Every structure is written in C-alpha cells, then in structure tokens.
C-alpha cells in the first residue's frame, strides 16, 4: 500500500513538472506564432529573466508540494501503517489468547470427564462393598437367629423331656404306692401295670 501511494505521488509530481515546463515554454514563446528549430535558442535567451523566474517558481512549487503534501501524506501513511500493524498484532494476540482459552477449556473438560468417571467408579465400588457388607451382616444375623432358635428348641425339648421324665417317675411312684396299698393279686397287678404303661404312651403321643 505504501509503495502504491509513493508511485502515485511521484507520477503526479512528474505530470505537474511536465505541465509547468510546458506552460513555461508557452510563456517564453507567446509572441512567436511559429517556432523553428534554428530560432529556439534565440527566442529563449532574450527571455532569460522570465525563464529564471519560472524556474524559481517551479522550485518553490516543488518544495511547497514536498512540505505541504508529501510529508503529511508520508506521515499519514506511516501512522496508518502503524495502526494497521497494531490492529494485526492485537488480532494475533487475541487469536492466541482465544486458542489458549480453548485449550484450557478442552483440558478442563477432559479433566472433568476423568474426575466424573473416577467418582462414578468409586461410587460403584463403594456400593458393591456396602452390598457385600449388608449381605454378610444379614447372613450373620440369619445364622445367629437360626442358631438361637435351635438352641431354644433344644432347650425346650430338654425341658419337655425332663418334665415328661419327672411326671413319669411321679406316676410310677404313685402307681407303686397304690399297688402297695391295694395288695392285689398278680393278674390285677399285671393289668394295672399294662394300663399304666398305656397311659404313659398316650401321654407321650399327646406331647
């Protein structure tokens, strides 16, 4: 862009120079209707002061164009170039920051997925451990209850047997007392004993 502006400016200066030079030639030969090659020099030298005046005006015009147009234009172009470079640098910096933020976001997302997976795995492991502990505890409690129930059954069974034996002994002693008291004959004693045994068996069956 800078090279293009410089080329346009130089082209403009050259065109202005040719235009001024043409005006200068016209002013030097304004009284001559036809210019011949052999009379050009003769026509220029009589107008030497006019030529010098035009040359001085041309130089002044060039300096004016240089200071009033070229330098401000060059300064503006430099400022514009600096502004564009600054904007490009800012855009590059913003792009780099955006890329860095994107990478950070992706890294955080990946870390979040890893942490979430670890949490789920830990929760599943703890759930399995808790389930296993509950099952073991339930089995222990069930086995303990079964053992206690069996102990109670055995205890009740022993009590019943002891009670039955005690009652049998008491009945036997009572029967013996009755035999002694009655003093019946052998047949009667035999019949009484058989009846007593049947009663004991009936009581055992009932229990």
UniProtKB/Swiss-Prot annotation:
- Membrane-crossing segments per the record: 49-69
Q: What is its main location?
A: membrane
Q: Where in the cell is it found?
A: Cell membrane
One Gene Ontology term, aspect cellular component: proton-transporting ATP synthase complex
InterPro entries in alphabetical order: ATP_synth_b/b'su_bac/chlpt (IPR002146), ATP_synth_F0_bsu_bac (IPR005864), ATP_synthase_B_chain (IPR050059)
Carries keyword Transmembrane? yes
Pfam families attached here?
ATP-synt_B
In this record, residues modified by a lipid of the kind S-diacylglycerol cysteine are: 28
- Kindly list the GO molecular function terms attached to this UniProt entry: proton-transporting ATP synthase activity, rotational mechanism; proton-transporting ATPase activity, rotational mechanism
Write down the membrane topology. Answer: Single-pass membrane protein
List the keywords (alphabetical). Answer: ATP synthesis, Cell membrane, CF(0), Hydrogen ion transport, Ion transport, Lipoprotein, Membrane, Palmitate, Signal, Transmembrane, Transmembrane helix, Transport
Lipid moiety-binding region for N-palmitoyl cysteine?
Answer: 28
Signal peptide residues on this chain, from the entry's feature table: 1-27
**How the protein assembles, per its UniProt entry?**
F-type ATPases have 2 components, F(1) - the catalytic core - and F(0) - the membrane proton channel. F(1) has five subunits: alpha(3), beta(3), gamma(1), delta(1), epsilon(1). F(0) has three main subunits: a(1), b(2) and c(10-14). The alpha and beta chains form an alternating ring which encloses part of the gamma chain. F(1) is attached to F(0) by a central stalk formed by the gamma and epsilon chains, while a peripheral stalk is formed by the delta and b chains.
Q: What does this protein do?
A: F(1)F(0) ATP synthase produces ATP from ADP in the presence of a proton or sodium gradient. F-type ATPases consist of two structural domains, F(1) containing the extramembraneous catalytic core and F(0) containing the membrane proton channel, linked together by a central stalk and a peripheral stalk. During catalysis, ATP synthesis in the catalytic domain of F(1) is coupled via a rotary mechanism of the central stalk subunits to proton translocation.
| HAMAP family, per database record | ATP_synth_b_bprime (MF_01398)
Q: Which family does it belong to?
A: Belongs to the ATPase B chain family.
Provide the protein name. ATP synthase subunit b
Give the originating organism.
Mycoplasma pneumoniae (strain ATCC 29342 / M129 / Subtype 1) (Mycoplasmoides pneumoniae)
């Amino acid at each position: 862009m800078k090279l293009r502006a410089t080329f346009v400016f130089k082209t403009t200066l050259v065109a202005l120079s040719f235009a001024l030079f043409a005006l200068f030639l016209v002013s030097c030969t304004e009284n001559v209707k036809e210019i011949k090659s052999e009379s050009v020099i003769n026509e220029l030298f009589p107008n030497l002061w006019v030529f010098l005046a035009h040359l001085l005006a041309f130089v002044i015009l060039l300096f004016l164009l240089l200071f009033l147009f070229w330098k401000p234009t060059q300064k503006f172009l430099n400022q514009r170039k600096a502004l564009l470079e600054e904007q490009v640098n800012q855009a590059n910096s913003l792009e780099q920051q955006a890329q860095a933020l994107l990478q950070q976001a992706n890294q955080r997302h990946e870390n979040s997925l890893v942490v979430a997976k670890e949490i789920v795995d830990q929760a599943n492991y703890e759930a399995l451990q808790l389930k296993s502990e509950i099952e073991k505890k339930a089995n222990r409690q069930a086995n303990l209850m079964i053992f206690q129930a069996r102990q109670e059954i055995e205890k009740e069974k022993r009590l019943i047997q002891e009670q039955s034996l005690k009652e049998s002994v008491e009945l036997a002693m009572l029967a013996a007392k009755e035999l002694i008291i009655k003093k019946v004959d052998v047949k009667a004693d035999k019949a009484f004993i058989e009846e007593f045994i049947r009663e004991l068996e009936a009581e055992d069956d009932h229990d």
